[in-house]
């Protein structure tokens, strides 16, 4: 067992006095923790740091190695509570055991010694030395020996520490009380036997998800589980700021990329900047790296041209509202069939397309096609996506069949959107908007005019 070295003479004397004179406690209590004003004789910041560092160093020295040992952090609330208990000079009181924090179990190590006999650091080191008499394999202390200070000191799940010291008077003898409080506490018993303080194994190999980091200082023998400083396992370059909740870098102006590693000074003249790719998304009718070039309308992509309007038939399927959005992104709208001529030409084309055209997305539910007509419950009528009233109609026989169930349509999305139905010679049918259909985008003259002149 590794432990801090003390001079042989003084170490032997301390051990004897601990056995003969020292009064010790190592217990678990549900106390009341409150923010209080600093008490006279409380540990200063340097002493607190030394005790915390010593505790963590000793916890990293346990043998066999601990797989789940937590790193301790200093708690001013626990320190105030420990100071208050040290001031009792070993006299138990029920008042400390009552209060608001009954659910928080706190473990205690306490030592009473003649004043000046030992420093707090030496007392903690002697608590750890009790481990020489503790068998981790058997989970018990040697006969007629005390190990409870040791087991509390190395209790794996304890994560907070606070200590206090007080000079007491006992007749003509000055007594010094040393107290440390640990939260959560340890030394739990099952059927009269104290359970082992930690699980053995490779350091940090059994850390829980909330403390998945592994802390190891230069003077530590092994690692201690801690809240990871950087759970994303990444860092942002060029003064980027890491959001550890999303593991995303917020880059300063002029930089982009996952780690802000790409210098980007691109300006989009007619478009918006896509930060993650350092590129421009151009407005309709513009192209080029900076969206500065006026481009011609891509008439070669039209499947049909009717009276100057361009119609594009999708090779993929989607819901009605997603299909409408995709047409809008291209600068058009879902097809608006306002005459028998357009209806006849589309029906003829789609009938031929049914057996000749390949699709890139076979995950569609029907062989039908969305057009830009929906039922508006507020107006109790079908309207085109532009808001225009539907004057021309080509509903199939018996359709629309959900028109009378307005409440059902609104509540469940039945029959609110219109498709060209293959089984009815591509006449219209009202359908659930969440159905996945192919769709037809239309580019009328007002859409095409936004592009550069072309043929």
UniProtKB/Swiss-Prot annotation:
Residues glycosylated per entry: 144
Localization in the cell: Secreted; Endoplasmic reticulum; Golgi apparatus; Endosome
Endpoints of the signal sequence: 1-26
Domain EGF-like residue range list: 228-261
GO molecular-function term, one example from the UniProt record: polysaccharide binding
Domain C-type lectin: 306-442
Disulfide links within the chain: 236-249, 251-260, 327-441, 417-433
Record keyword Endoplasmic reticulum present: yes
GO cellular component annotations of the record: endosome; extracellular space; Golgi apparatus; sarcoplasmic reticulum
Residue span, SCP domain: 52-182
Database matches in CDD domains: CAP_euk (cd05380), CLECT (cd00037), EGF_CA (cd00054)
Function of the molecule: Binds polysaccharides in a Ca(2+)-independent manner.
Protein name: C-type lectin domain family 18 member B
Source species of the chain: Homo sapiens
């Amino acid at each position: 067992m590794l432990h801090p070295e003390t001079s042989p003479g003084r170490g032997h004397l301390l051990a004897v006095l601990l056995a003969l004179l020292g009064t010790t406690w190592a217990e678990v209590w549900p106390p009341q923790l409150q923010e209080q004003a600093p008490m006279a004789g409380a540990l200063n910041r340097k002493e607190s740091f030394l005790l915390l560092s010593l505790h963590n160093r000793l916890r990293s020295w346990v043998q066999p190695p601990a797989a789940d040992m937590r790193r301790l952090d200093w708690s001013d609330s626990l320190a105030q509570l420990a100071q208050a208990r040290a001031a009792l000079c070993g006299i138990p009181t029920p008042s400390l055991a009552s209060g608001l924090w009954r659910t928080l179990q706190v473990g205690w190590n306490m030592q009473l010694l003649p004043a000046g006999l030992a420093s707090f650091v030496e007392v903690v080191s002697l608590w750890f030395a009790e481990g020489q008499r503790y068998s981790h394999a058997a989970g018990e202390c040697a006969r007629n020996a005390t190990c409870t200070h040791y087991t509390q000191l190395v209790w794996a799940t304890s994560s907070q520490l606070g200590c206090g010291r007080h000079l007491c008077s006992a007749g003509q003898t000055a007594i010094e009380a040393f107290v440390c409080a640990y939260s959560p506490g340890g030394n739990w018993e099952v059927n009269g036997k104290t359970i082992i303080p930690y699980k053995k194994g490779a350091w940090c190999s059994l850390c829980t998800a909330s403390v998945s980091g592994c802390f190891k200082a230069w003077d530590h023998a092994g690692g201690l589980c801690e809240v990871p400083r950087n759970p994303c396992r990444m860092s942002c370059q060029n003064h980027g700021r890491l959001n550890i909740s999303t593991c995303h870098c917020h880059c300063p102006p002029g930089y982009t990329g996952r780690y802000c590693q790409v210098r980007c000074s691109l300006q989009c003249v007619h478009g918006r900047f896509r930060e993650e790719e350092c590129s421009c998304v151009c407005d309709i009718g513009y192209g080029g790296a900076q969206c500065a070039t006026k481009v011609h309308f891509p008439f070669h992509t039209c499947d049909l041209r009717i009276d100057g309007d361009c119609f594009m038939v999708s090779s993929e399927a989607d819901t009605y509202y997603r299909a409408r959005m995709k047409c809008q992104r291209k600068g058009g709208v879902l097809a608006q069939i306002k005459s028998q001529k357009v209806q006849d030409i589309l029906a003829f084309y789609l009938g031929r397309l049914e057996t000749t055209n390949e699709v890139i997305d076979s995950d569609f539910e029907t062989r039908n096609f969305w057009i830009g007509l929906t039922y508006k419950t507020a107006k109790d009528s079908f309207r085109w996506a532009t808001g225009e009233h539907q004057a021309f109609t080509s509903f199939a026989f018996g359709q629309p069949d959900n028109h009378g169930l307005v409440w059902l349509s609104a509540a469940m999305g039945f029959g609110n959107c219109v498709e060209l139905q293959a089984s009815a010679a591509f006449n219209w049918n009202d359908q659930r908007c969440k159905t996945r259909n192919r769709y037809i985008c239309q580019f009328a003259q007002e859409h095409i005019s936004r592009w550069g002149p072309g043929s």
